[in-house]
Amino acid sequence: VPYYRVDITNKDEFSKLPNDVYAVVDLAGAMPARMKGYNPYKYIDVNITGNLNILEYCRKNNADRILFAQSFGDIKDYGDKNPLLRVDLPRKFSFTTDHTIYVMSKNFAVDMIENYHQMYGLKRFIFRLPTIYLYSPVDTFYVDGVERKIGYRLLIDRAIAGEPIEVWGNSSRVKDMVYVKDFCQMLYKALFVNRNCGYYNVGTGVGTSLLDQIKGMIDVFGENGKKSNIIMRPDKPNAPQYIMDITPAIQELGYHPQYNYLEMLQDFKKEMQLHKINGGGTDIM
């Protein structure tokens, strides 16, 4: 597959790309988890100007459709009262955090895509993403502009080492643990579906409690005779909770998740092992 490196904020660089495209899968974007410090101009330059350049590329080259990755930051605040997040929930997000302009920029990108859909007939498929779980050798991200270990990677590391693991807050709070390979399945189906548009939550439609998440990590990654002890800490803050309603994706795309939580962890472990075999380090035996 040919690879082109393009700065999407520079419209002139799009001349590098082929002009006989059927579909554009737009996963480009600036996000808080990958931003050192806080530079809101990046969100405007990349998520708005950059995506406008992508839309113009689609228009000029008569692309049939665009697939776009939206953040679930526009509705995730509903989850604290009712974890089931429907696709059609009105936007609701905080205006007081360093995520605000990020969420606004992604919302505006979605609105720009709708404009090109209605004005030029560009078919559009929007995918609202929560955390997508996958193995990567990069196990850090940024919180409030400061680099930290990704939470679930820290828990997996403790399970591998057989170290005690604390369960913070209400252990029954649930999260939709969607694997990257199921997200890819959804994208693939949208590439060829006979529809003009769609708006989909990415997920499994199933919630896994925090306690079951940690038990699963211990079962899959812990060594026999060296399993982590679980320490309940209800005095600590609660984890976020949400379940993505995937009904439209099931009905319109024929999407069906292939990985439940434990199957995801098992495949995650295989990917870690392959990374080590291929010379990527000493993650896990």
Predicted regions: what is each one?
Residues 24-28, 66-72, 127-129:
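SDR active-site strand-loop-helix element
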Residues 80-83, 114-174, 180-185, 189, ...:
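NAD(P)-dependent short-chain dehydrogenase/reductase
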Residues 8-46, 77:
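NAD(P)H-binding glycine-rich loop region in Rossmannoid oxidoreductase-like domains
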Residues 159-285:
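C-terminal substrate-binding subdomain of Rossmann-fold SDR/epimerase-dehydratase oxidoreductases
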Residues 101, 105-108:
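Active-site helix of classical SDR
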Residues 22, 41, 45-52, 60, ...:
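Conserved internal alpha-helix in NAD(P)-dependent oxidoreductase domains
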Residues 52-101:
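Conserved Rossmann-fold NAD(P)-dependent oxidoreductase catalytic core, especially the SDR/UDP-sugar
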Residues 31-34, 72-79, 130-133:
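Active-site segment of SDR-like NAD(P)-dependent oxidoreductases
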